């Protein structure tokens, strides 16, 4: 079992979370097996979570698992630099007590390894076991029978919110991956990370926390418990240093009274934009108004109009 007091003390001893930057050590890892961390970009969520995973690897031999929605998102050009900040800050040497000084991504294995390299960047030694393994939701069926890891106690689901892809069928295969990794252990932690703050994302409805999430304000953190007792820690991250820098950028480029820019400016949910048709008694006729559709836990009333210009409208 992971001793989180010990983990936090080790992180502080190593000095890998400098003051003025967001770090995840305040998150409720003891009580909640699922964490959802939401923010704008450049807060340092992924780097912070990877650093904690590295400390868990050092203390307990934990293998980090990094999950994206599709195999295409695991291209070397996308994921090879995940540890770049950690490497450049010299944290690899700190966490490994000088044994290694860099991290290498092996493309054909989809694994990251600690390595020791000389001043010219030539590899001298590679760790025998990988630090992190990459997985994709669209490959979930293959993991069921072909993969197991008894130390998969740090599971990262990166960029879980996307406005570009249809993901509503991802929930079951994603949880299949969790089940494959966790097996019968209760020591694992699942961390969802998002740079797009979309209040209507399907995952909130699948976990039946959509109403609670909608009440979150910038800087809030809360614990939600399901009727069956599963606890989720969710945080809408507010980083003071990032917010200060954002103010200047927003004033120069995004200072418009337009809700569509809310998520770009930071501190608010992204707003979905839908076209609306103006209807008047002169250009349309109401045909039905007692049609109801149940979706995402809500009952929506739909009215059908006959328009003179474009026909039937719902």
Q: Where is each model-derived feature located?
A:
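Phosphate/NTP-binding elements of NTP-utilizing enzymes
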Residues: 2-314
């Amino acid at each position: 079992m992971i001793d989180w007091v010990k983990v936090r003390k080790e992180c502080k001893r190593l000095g890998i979370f400098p003051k003025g930057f967001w770090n995840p050590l305040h998150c409720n890892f003891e009580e909640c097996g699922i964490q959802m961390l939401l923010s704008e970009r450049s807060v340092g969520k992924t780097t912070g979570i990877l650093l904690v995973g590295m400390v868990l690897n050092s203390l307990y031999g934990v293998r980090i698992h990094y999950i994206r929605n599709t195999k295409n998102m695991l291209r070397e050009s996308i994921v090879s630099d995940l540890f770049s900040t950690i490497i450049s800050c010299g944290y690899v040497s700190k966490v490994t007590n000088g044994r290694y000084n860099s991290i290498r991504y092996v493309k054909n294995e989809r694994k990251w390894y600690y390595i020791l390299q000389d001043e010219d960047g030539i590899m001298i030694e590679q760790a025998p076991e990988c630090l992190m393994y990459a997985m994709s939701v669209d490959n979930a069926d293959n993991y069921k029978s072909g993969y197991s890891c008894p130390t998969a106690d740090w599971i990262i689901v990166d960029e879980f919110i996307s406005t570009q892809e249809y993901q509503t069928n991802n929930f079951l295969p994603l949880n299949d991956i969790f089940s494959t990794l966790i097996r019968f252990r209760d020591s694992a932690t699942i961390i969802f990370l998002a740079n797009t703050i979309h209040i209507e994302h399907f995952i909130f409805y699948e976990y039946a926390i959509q109403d609670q999430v909608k009440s979150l304000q910038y800087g809030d953190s809360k614990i939600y418990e399901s009727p069956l007792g599963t606890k989720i820690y969710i945080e809408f991250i507010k980083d003071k240093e990032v917010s200060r820098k954002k103010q200047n950028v927003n004033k120069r480029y995004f200072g418009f009274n337009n809700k569509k820019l809310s998520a770009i400016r930071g501190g608010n949910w992204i707003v979905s934009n839908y076209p609306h048709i103006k209807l008047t008694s002169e250009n349309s006729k109401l045909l039905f108004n007692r049609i109801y559709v149940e979706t995402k836990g809500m009952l929506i009333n739909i009215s059908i109009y006959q328009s003179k210009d474009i026909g039937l409208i719902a």
